[in-house]
Amino acid sequence: MAVTITVAAFIVLAVLGAGAAMTTVGDWYHSLRKPSWNPPDWVFGPAWTVILGLAGAAGVLAWMAAGDGNTRVRIAILFAINIVLHLLWSPLFFNLKRPDWALIEVPFLWLSVVALIVGLAPLSAPAAWLLAPYLLWVAFAAYLNLTIVRMNAPFG
């Protein structure tokens, strides 16, 4: 169990580190018009840290509940797809300065969280519930993304 927790912690930290390294929030972002309900910049780091920590815990619970290697492979594939989609959004929005492209990508990220919940629920109901904040935050971020696109389009 200690190895599983260590691996999950490493993956969460790697995702956080990669996301931070690939995100450059600069003058361009600060110049965008944003809705009055846009959270302050400092909220996003702690929010994602908690959400990805919960996702890591969900992965550990599901991994421990998995009865065989095939189930663990399925868990790993679901998380791998989610990680790729999670890491894709920030460069689209911030580095390429294309919130419109990020808006096209975000439904796939949201669906990958749904797939995680559906895939983990039969193994561990608590694991599935630990992913609920992730799903809600991505839905909120998608609506914020949509609003920013509407307030600032066109891009590119």
Spell out what each predicted region is.
Residues A76-W89, L103-L116, L131-V138:
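Hydrophobic alpha-helical segments of small multi-pass membrane proteins
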Residues M1-A21:
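N-terminal signal-anchor transmembrane alpha helix
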Residues D68-G69, P91-D100, A121-A125:
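Membrane-interface helix caps and helix-loop-helix hairpins in membrane proteins
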Residues G17-T24, T49, L61:
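Transmembrane alpha-helix/helix-exit interface in multi-pass inner-membrane proteins
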Residues G53-S90:
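Helix-adjacent hinge/juxtasegments
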Residues P39-L54, R98-L109:
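Membrane-interface loop-to-helix entry segments
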Residues A121-G156:
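Terminal transmembrane helical module of multi-pass membrane proteins
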Residues T23-P40, V149, F155:
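Cytosolic, membrane-interface loops and tails of multi-pass inner-membrane proteins
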